[in-house]
A protein has these predicted regions:
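Short, electropositive, low-hydrophobicity segments enriched in small/polar residues
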Residues: 71, 111, 118
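Extracellular/periplasmic catalytic domains that process cell-envelope and extracellular macromolecules
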Residues: 1-6, 41-44, 105-106, 126-128, ...
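Solvent-exposed loop/turn segments at secondary-structure junctions
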Residues: 10, 18-20, 55-58, 117-120, ...
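Short, well-ordered amphipathic alpha-helices
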Residues: 34-36, 119-122
Length: 170
C-alpha cells in the first residue's frame, strides 16, 4: 500500500523575455516544438538550453513527441527518438538533472526541460524582474507520482507511520 505524496510533471521552463526576444511573437510557447524543432531550438542556443540528464524520461518524451508509444522498446522507434535527440544536441548547452534550477532563474539558460517542482523553485528564486514560465506542452507531458510506503520489514514501522501521518496533516 502507498499514500500519494506528490505529483510532478516534466515540461519546459523558460525565461519569457529571452525566449520572446530570440523567437519573436511566433514562438511556439505551447508546444514541444520549442525544444524538438532544430530550427527553433537553434535560435535559443545563444541564451542557453538545458535538458534533464534522465535518458528514460527524455527518450519517452521524444517518443511521445514523434507520435510513438513513450514506453516503446522497439529498436526502430528508439532509433527515431535517438535521431531526434541528435538533431537538437548541438544546440543544448548541457544535460543535467538539477543545475537548471539555479541557471534558469539567474539567466544562464533560457529554456530547460525539467521537473515542474524544480522549475517553480527556479521561478521563485529568479532575479528581480525575471519571469520564468512553466509549460505543459499541448502534445502532453509525463506525470510522476511519489508515494510514501512502509516496507514490510521496516525496523521502526510505528515511526514511519507517525511520519506519514505528520506529512498528511493539512
Amino acid at each position: 500500500h502507498g499514500v500519494p505524496y506528490m505529483i510532478n510533471t516534466i515540461g519546459l521552463g523558460y525565461n519569457v523575455a529571452k525566449v520572446t526576444e530570440a523567437l519573436g511573437a511566433d514562438a511556439p510557447l505551447d508546444s514541444w516544438d520549442l525544444l524538438f524543432k532544430p530550427e527553433v531550438v537553434e535560435k535559443l542556443a545563444s541564451c542557453g538550453v538545458s535538458v534533464l540528464d534522465s535518458p528514460s524520461e527524455v527518450m519517452g518524451i521524444a517518443l511521445h513527441y514523434l507520435g510513438l508509444d513513450p514506453n516503446s522498446e522497439s529498436e526502430e522507434d528508439l532509433a527515431k527518438a535517438e535521431a531526434l535527440m541528435a538533431s537538437i544536441k548541438p544546440h543544448i548547452r548541457y544535460f543535467h538533472s538539477s543545475q537548471y534550477i539555479d541557471d534558469l532563474g539567474n539567466g544562464e539558460v533560457c529554456l530547460s526541460l525539467g521537473y515542474s517542482g524544480d522549475i517553480f523553485i527556479a521561478s521563485d528564486n529568479a532575479a528581480e524582474g525575471v519571469e520564468i514560465n512553466y509549460l505543459i506542452p499541448k502534445e502532453g507531458a509525463a506525470t510522476l507520482f511519489d508515494f510514501l510506503a512502509i516496507p514490510g520489514d521496516a525496523p521502526n514501522p510505528e515511526n514511519a507511520l507517525a511520519f506519514i501521518n505528520y506529512i498528511l496533516e493539512p
